[in-house]
Amino acid sequence: MAQENPKMHNSEISKRLGAEWKLLSEAEKRPFIDDSKRLRAMHMKEYPDYKYRP
């Protein structure tokens, strides 16, 4: 979406992607959720002492 609309602000891209996400069924979301869990576990293993600090 960002490549198709290079002048669009990140906040607008996030809103549109969020709206598209809400339209997906649980089955369509499942691969992304599973991948997110896998990546989170991998990150926790590689960086056990990591603390988010904004």
Curated annotation (Swiss-Prot):
Indicate the residues that the entry says bind DNA: 1-54
Query: Transmembrane stretches, by residue range?
Result: none
SMART domains per UniProt: HMG
Q: Name one GO cellular component term.
A: nucleus
The entry's keywords: DNA-binding, Nucleus
What InterPro entries has UniProt attached to this entry?
A: HMG_box_dom, HMG_box_dom_sf, SRY-related_HMG-box_TF-like
What is the name listed in the Swiss-Prot or TrEMBL entry for this protein? SRY-related protein CH4
| Compartments in which it is found | Nucleus
Q: Name one Pfam family in it.
A: HMG_box
Molecular function in Gene Ontology: DNA binding
